[in-house]
Swiss-Prot record:
Main subcellular location of this protein, as a coarse class: secreted
Coiled-coil stretches noted in the UniProt entry, renumbered to this chain: none
Residue span, Kazal-like domain: 4-54
Keyword set, alphabetical order: Disulfide bond, Glycoprotein, Protease inhibitor, Repeat, Secreted, Serine protease inhibitor
Record's protein name: Ovomucoid
Family matches, as SMART domains: KAZAL
Localization per record: Secreted
Length: 54
């Protein structure tokens, strides 16, 4: 299982850095910040499927 540490999130603003991650919802998130904010919003139900686009 691939783990991303989201303990520093949520953050109000994410950078425009593009390092895609694929969530367990089959959605591609543009970077760790976008992904971690979504994880927080999902109350922990969202996980990382893999690094890169879905």
């Amino acid at each position: 299982i691939t783990i991303v540490d989201c303990s520093d999130y949520p953050k109000p603003v994410c950078s425009l850095e593009y390092m895609p991650l694929c969530g367990s919802d089959s959605k591609t998130y543009s970077n760790k910040c976008d992904f971690c904010n979504a994880v927080v919003d999902s109350n922990g139900t969202l996980n990382l499927s893999h690094f890169g686009k879905c």
